[in-house]
Structures are given as structure tokens and as C-alpha cells.
């Protein structure tokens, strides 16, 4: 069965692979699951037809037959549960899926929004420095856990997929530079052929819209 993914018609990240549909694309490429894409404009996200799929009017959503899912973490978990190759053998390793979106992502996203929207504010430098410290604390904790390992819990799993995608938002910030093992970790994720196929697919959508 082919899944249907809802993604941005014109992604605000300008095709850099940071929108959350990228996580879902990557997961489907990892397990070899065919999918179709429904492209949505920002206006379409506000319409009743989309709100019936995603109550918060966001992307991504995924349709698997009669099942409709929203939230990227829930979608990636669904894919991992239904296909071999992404679900961790060790149940504890599943925690990394939720750590990525519940612990790592919030301060990283807050920093990203500050850098994007608050540069002209008088408090910008002080606030950015505070957010940098918060993010670096989490990076230090993650770095110590990873150590010299390739992946967080043995073999590559959905937890690594989610974590790598969250960390990619720090590219260009310099915050990963103090943690060489995390830089290498992200590079390993990007080097996976499934990631590269997913990135190319979302990039093609952006280029077609510009």
C-alpha cells in the first residue's frame, strides 16, 4: 500500500531539509515504503479538509489506508512499527525518539526562531547567549552519552533518525563544533542513502516551486 504524505508546497526552509516532513520521508526511504505527496500551501493548512487531518493545521500528516496521523514523531513511530529496520531491538532505545522531539528540539527551535525573528530587538544578544547556553548543555549531555559510538543505542534506529534531523537545524550556528563526535554523528546520518533520497525529493519540490 502506498502512503500519502502532506508536505509544504513551498517550504519556509528553502529546501534545506529542515521541515518536519523530511523526517517522514527519510523514515519511508529507510524501510522502502512507497509514498505519494500531497503538497499544501500555507492557506490550505487552514482549511477544514486539512484541519480534519491535523487539528493544529501543521505538516506533516500521513494517510495509511483509513488511518490518518499527524505529528512527525507519531508518524515515524508508526512507520517503524510496521516495517523492519527502524524499530530499536532494545525498548529503552525507543526513548531517543521522544528525547529528540521533547528534550532536544524545543531549545534548538527557540534558538532558531530567536535568530530569525529577534535580531532587531535590543535584548537579542543577551537572549541568544542564554539560548546558546541551554542548547550547549543538551549537546554536552548528548555528546557524553554517544561517546565513540556510531549510533545512540547500537544499530541505527528511528531514535537516531529523529535526533540527527533535530541537530541539523544547528548547522551554521557553530554550536556543534565543540562536540566533534556529534558532528561526525550528524554526518553519518546525512551519508545514509535513504537520507540522501529523501533530501533530494524534498529539494525537488522546493525547486519546482521557485
Where are these regions (language model features)?
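GST-like domain detector, emphasizing the conserved glutathione-binding G-site
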Residues: 1-126
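A generic structural-conservation signal
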Residues: 37, 155, 179, 198-199
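Active-site-flanking alpha-helical
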Residues: 80, 166-167, 199
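Residue-level signal for well-ordered alpha-helical positions
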Residues: 82, 111, 173, 201-202
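A short, terminal or domain-edge coil/loop segment
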Residues: 86-96, 141-148, 168, 201-210
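GST-like fold's C-terminal all-alpha helical module
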Residues: 100-191
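Long hydrophobic alpha-helical segments typical of transmembrane helices together
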Residues: 182-210
Amino acid at each position: 500500500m502506498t502512503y500519502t504524505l502532506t508536505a509544504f508546497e513551498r517550504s519556509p526552509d528553502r529546501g534545506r531539509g529542515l521541515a518536519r516532513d523530511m523526517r517522514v520521508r527519510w523514515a519511508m526511504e529507510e524501510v522502502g515504503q512507497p509514498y505519494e505527496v500531497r503538497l499544501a500551501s500555507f492557506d490550505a493548512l487552514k482549511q477544514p479538509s486539512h484541519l480534519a487531518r491535523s487539528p493544529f493545521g501543521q505538516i506533516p500528516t500521513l494517510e495509511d489506508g483509513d488511518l490518518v496521523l499527524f505529528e512527525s514523531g507519531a508518524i515515524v513511530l508508526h512507520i517503524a512499527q510496521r516495517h523492519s529496520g527502524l524499530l530499536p531491538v532494545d525498548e529503552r532505545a525507543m526513548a531517543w525518539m521522544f528525547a529528540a522531539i521533547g528534550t532536544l528540539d524545543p531549545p534548538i527551535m527557540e534558538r532558531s526562531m530567536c535568530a530569525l525573528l529577534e535580531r532587531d530587538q535590543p535584548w537579542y544578544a543577551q537572549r541568544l547567549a542564554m539560548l546558546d547556553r541551554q542548547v550547549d548543555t543538551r549537546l554536552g549531555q548528548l555528546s557524553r552519552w554517544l561517546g565513540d559510538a556510531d549510533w545512540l543505542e547500537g544499530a541505527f534506529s528511528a531514535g537516531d533518525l529523529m535526533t540527527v534531523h533535530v541537530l541539523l537545524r544547528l548547522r551554521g550556528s557553530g554550536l556543534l563544533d565543540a562536540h566533534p563526535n556529534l558532528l561526525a554523528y550528524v554526518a553519518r546520518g546525512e551519508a545514509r542513502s535513504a537520507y540522501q533520497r529523501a533530501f533530494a525529493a524534498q529539494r525537488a519540490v522546493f525547486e519546482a516551486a521557485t
